[in-house]
Regions:
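Short amphipathic alpha-helical segments
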Residues: 49, 85-87, 190-192, 214-215, ...
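Glycine-rich phosphate/diphosphate-binding loop of Rossmann-like nucleotide-binding domains
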Residues: 7-44, 160-243
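An N-terminal-biased, well-structured beta-alpha scaffold segment characteristic
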Residues: 2-112, 116-118
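Short, hinge-like loop/turn segments at secondary-structure boundaries
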Residues: 53-56, 138-141, 218-223
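Short, acidic/turn-prone active-site loops that include or flank metal/cofactor-
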Residues: 64, 99-102, 125-126, 206-207, ...
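Glycine/serine-rich phosphate-binding loop and adjoining beta1-alpha1 elements at the start
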Residues: 2-10, 82-175
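Rossmann-like NAD(P)-binding element
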Residues: 65-81, 221-259
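Residue-level detector of alpha-helix initiation sites
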Residues: 78, 142, 183-184
Length: 259
């Protein structure tokens, strides 16, 4: 099979889809496949073209060449208007975040891809046997582990925060950090907040998940609570509230001191 790695057209997007980084490309080539990459595809992420060339991948100048030559296209972000102008081929496989199952699909894009006979694989809906999402799980870990650090920054006065430090300071009270949802990202956020020395509470409506979290979060208060109960009982007691994007847990009283 011939694999292709095009550059992403969205601003500030430096990720590469389908795990097609140099070491994985080397594995594909060792198995007899061919891999093309667009010039500069990973330079924004600090990976040079030379690293792809060293493992046997072939460089092309344009995105059009990738689509013309390759059977499998590995992207990361959803298809932009520029992506949709590419020369698709019947039987071609495109793996990227299509977002077609989330109510945001563009009918005109679906029609173009269907008429071209392209097979679309949505990375955001691909799951492991345990139900976790294969491509979003590592991103959830990154987001979860960095969220308390960024949230702690916005607790500072110059960012409109309360002035409470997220790390322990002698003679001062600890920051109280709330995490809405104990999924993978929430668990990672709690581990970071614990490590920083904050007082941490995690809310979830899945008792089995809370029981599991009890085994990995030794200094975190775990609460079985709905969003309405949270809003009434706890929201005003917090310094920092963290929640994954798309969560339905929202309350207007979070204000500038919550992120």
């Amino acid at each position: 099979m011939i694999f292709g790695i095009p550059r992403e057209l969205k601003d500030h997007e430096t990720r590469v889809g389908a795990g097609l980084i140099p070491r994985n490309v080397a594995t594909l080539i060792a198995q007899g496949h061919t891999v093309y990459f667009q010039k500069g595809v990973m330079e924004p992420a600090g990976v040079s073209d030379e690293e792809f060339l060293k493992v046997g991948a072939k460089c092309v100048d344009t995105m059009e060449e990738i689509y013309e030559k390759c059977d499998f296209i590995g992207k990361f972000k959803d298809m932009t208007d520029g992506d949709m102008k590419m020369p698709f081929k019947k039987g071609q496989i495109i793996m990227t975040a299509f977002h077609m199952a989330e109510g945001t699909a563009k009918p005109e894009q679906v029609k173009i891809l269907a008429d071209a006979g392209v097979t679309c694989i949505s990375i955001e809906t691909s799951r492991y046997p345990d139900g976790s999402r294969a491509m979003t799980r590592p991103m959830g870990e990154i987001a979860g582990r960095t969220a308390p650090l960024l949230g702690g920054q916005y607790l500072q006065r110059q960012y409109g925060g309360s002035g409470v430090s997220i790390v322990p300071v002698t003679g001062a009270r600890r920051a109280r950090v709330c995490i809405l949802g104990g999924g993978h990202a929430g668990m990672c956020a709690a581990q970071t907040a614990e490590g920083l020395g904050a007082e941490v509470v995690v809310f979830d409506v899945n008792i089995q998940r809370l029981e599991y979290l009890r085994t990995v979060l030794k200094n975190t208060d775990l609460r079985f609570m709905s969003k309405s109960a949270f809003a009434e009982e706890v929201a005003d007691q917090l310094h920092l509230c963290l929640s994954r994007h798309g969560s339905s847990h929202r309350d207007p009283r979070y204000g500038s001191q919550h992120a």
